[in-house]
Amino acid sequence: MKVVGGLRAIAAGLAAGMILGSCATAPRARDQQLAGPVAAPAASSVAPWPRREVLDLALQAYRCGRTLGYIDRPLLTVIDYSLPSTERRLWVIDVANRRVLFNELVAHGERSGENLAVAFSNRPGSRQSSLGLFRADDTYEGEHGLSLRLTGLEAGVNDRARDRRIVMHGAAYVSEGFAAERGRLGRSWGCPALPSGVHAQVIDRIRDGSAVFAYYPDPRWLQSSRFLHCDARIAKAP
């Protein structure tokens, strides 16, 4: 499916160069520096689906993104930031075959909250997570190993993700052992970090055009998101 011009404009933000304090280029996060030996991530187990209300919104945003040409693949990653970091709050869903492929732990930004994420931002240097619909794009090998670039599709909500170098990557501070020791996962500088034992499998599965939907019950975003109100706004799509 052809990606519309709006996506090309968003991706063009790469030309702005690197932003200091970004998730992908930062020194090891403070939580990781403090962590001693941590247990290896538990084997992934395909668990229940996201909560019905979250899944309904995620599917609505995914279908709108497909209709508008932003999403190429029938895969949907759902992150429910309303859940504590100690719960497996990331799902990768095969929409076409109606099945969950992965259900994993995922970290939020260090300034979004402790065990619970409560604050979100689109601003470079905020070290907070962002909400809304993203496109999973290309991969590269960085300081965290295999990493996946995310393109934010929502103006004013997450469309500076590429400038902020918000990527999906693996981290030692995302593990059952770390959570048991600290009562929460470690935190990133805004990136959705995954357990280092499974991140490469997840990234390789969702790369190159699938949807990533990050949820929190923020009233302003829920009311204004173009991808959650597609029927009313589709005629105005770029």
Question: Where in the sequence are the language-model features?
Answer:
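Bacterial N-terminal signal peptides that target proteins for export
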Residues: 1-11
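Cell wall/extracellular polymer interaction/catalysis modules
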Residues: 26-189, 197-205, 210, 214-238
